Amino acid sequence: MLDATTAGGWTPLDVATLKPSLMSLSPHRFHGPKGVGVLYKRRGVSLVPLIHGGNQEFGLRAGTENVASIVGAGKAFELMSGILDERIENACKLQTFLLREIKTKIPSTGIIGPAPGKDRLSNQLNIVFEGVEGEALMLMTNVRGLDCHTGISCVNRHMESNRIPEATGLPDDLFRSSLLLSWHEEHTMADLRGAVEIIAACVGKLREMSPVWNNLQCGRMPSRLSLLPETVKSS
């Protein structure tokens, strides 16, 4: 099973090359309707029906189809296939600009994952702001009009994080000090510059109140940013 819900619309996905048994896509990632998903199933792969009954959707989900959403998803795929390269190119420029702005204006930051390039999606950055609690930063920036969320977006009702920190080999606290920012091809550098101004002001205010930041500045705690690649950190 290949989960391509985030990658769809932001990187070429060729099932002949990838050879997945199953692949999921989310059309709202490329301006399709929300609430509809797409599942690619390789020929010969058998699935148990999600809802038993009628033979709708190849017998996998009984009930009347959501025709409007299906048509909307198909149209989104059609439109995106013609502009994918241009969309990725524009998003890459915004990504490089955003990272440069953050490294210039906010000290002690870094990104989780590879530097911008072929090994990273072009429409997002997971940014660590050392000495800051990510949820507090998210709430403060949201109030000021910036739509973002914490670096760990999938948590259960007990606020236990998902397995991403374990998979990356990075400590959980780096993720808990991060924001995940994303954008699309219609955003501008002015939009991103405004976002950085909001984040910088909020980070500064939170660090003024942070005992962790104070300990880092006084040398009583080692910086965890040393675990990130040098190319993605600011001093």
Could you describe each region identified by the protein language model?
Residues 1-235:
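Pyridoxal 5′-phosphate
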